[in-house]
């Protein structure tokens, strides 16, 4: 999910106890990174994918934490505070999309990526699945990942820097460097194992925060009567359909389509120890997501009553959680809640860094060095993976150095870009024997292009007809599906091995 992109302008008071809690949080992340480093054996698959040995509970919470980012704690409560319950449509779409993802994509992807040459990245899976000897598909999909995730990562660094600036009154660049250093440390040294464990730890912090803040806020207001007060202030605050047209509802609901093609999320399914563990992961993951999102909605709704009751001037709705955590709680607890925001931001940054590093190493460096070198020089490739983490982070920091850079405006569309270009391709690759390399390349590129064209030239026409304001993932997804299918039908069919592999994957997934 998208990280915060807007400025956090509401400064709150912080004392030494708050700083101590943040320091303890950072120390725990460093220890986990060191633990991941000590567990490493110099194997590339282990560094990038945890050796496919991750349990269901870490899988579930790491997928959730890397997905939600600062949006769940900052963006969603701010949106509900500003518009009321109608903002909840996006949470319904996301929860449904994530739930379907666990059923439709997760089991087959876990089995198929191992069967198809033990692929450790999505582009590598596409290459092996479609016998792409020229590596065209691998290079194009790898480039999409590297470019978009570098921008994604930059957005996370901006959010971290602005959090320290707004919550502590510290210099933006100091906060940026501090967040970057901690994330780079545990990702660089600990690899996938450290990232997954820290995501689990951060997921727990995020969940506690999203349950604690609205409950304490209600206790300090009017209990369950707080929602009655919110409705009395403005009846439409609790109206799920307020201010939304059919197009608006569909646009919010369609965010769920993006899940099937988000590399930093579906890589979690590839790393789980066995596909048979996915039901456990699904139950915990979806429960975590539902409770967390409902908590975020509750923060926004209680905030509508909280702000006037405490005579607070809220300059930026996205700072609502920060303000409530500092006003309602002891500084030590307030520090814990600020750590929850950092957890949300940093869990996404680390996941995106590692996916980008994996792509640079597996999808590009391996092409230069060759398959045989990759098998016999594993430590070299692990070192290249670590250096890739550092390089991508430095580029993202450089872009984030100017937080007002216009590139930030593009990051909000990356979810749609991945969803339109990768989601249909992943589904076709897992279920349809007729998919061809030409169809895959055409569908992926057309989906991405439609998203770009829709954002640049179609959406500005929304004032003429609201259909033009449709969320860009919908036209992008539809065009990608059509182009992939039509081009695959018109081009040379894949070999018989594809049907054999698909049947084998289906049979393994059905095993109890």
Curated annotation (Swiss-Prot):
Observed effect of gene inactivation: Cells lacking this gene display an approximate 33% overall decline in L-proline uptake and exhibit significantly reduced virulence in several animal models, thus showing a negative impact on the ability of this pathogen to survive in vivo.
GO-annotated biological processes: proline transport; transmembrane transport
Keywords, in A-Z order: Amino-acid transport, Cell membrane, Ion transport, Membrane, Sodium, Sodium transport, Symport, Transmembrane, Transmembrane helix, Transport
Catalytic activity as recorded in UniProt: L-proline(in) + Na(+)(in) = L-proline(out) + Na(+)(out)
Membrane topology type: Multi-pass membrane protein
This protein's GO CC annotations: plasma membrane
Induction details: Up-regulated by high osmotic environment, such as increasing concentrations of NaCl, and low L-proline concentrations.
PROSITE patterns named among the record's database cross-references: NA_SOLUT_SYMP_3
Protein name per UniProt: Sodium/proline symporter
Native species: Staphylococcus aureus (strain NCTC 8325 / PS 47)
Organism phylogeny: Bacteria, Bacillati, Bacillota, Bacilli, Bacillales
Name of encoding gene: putP
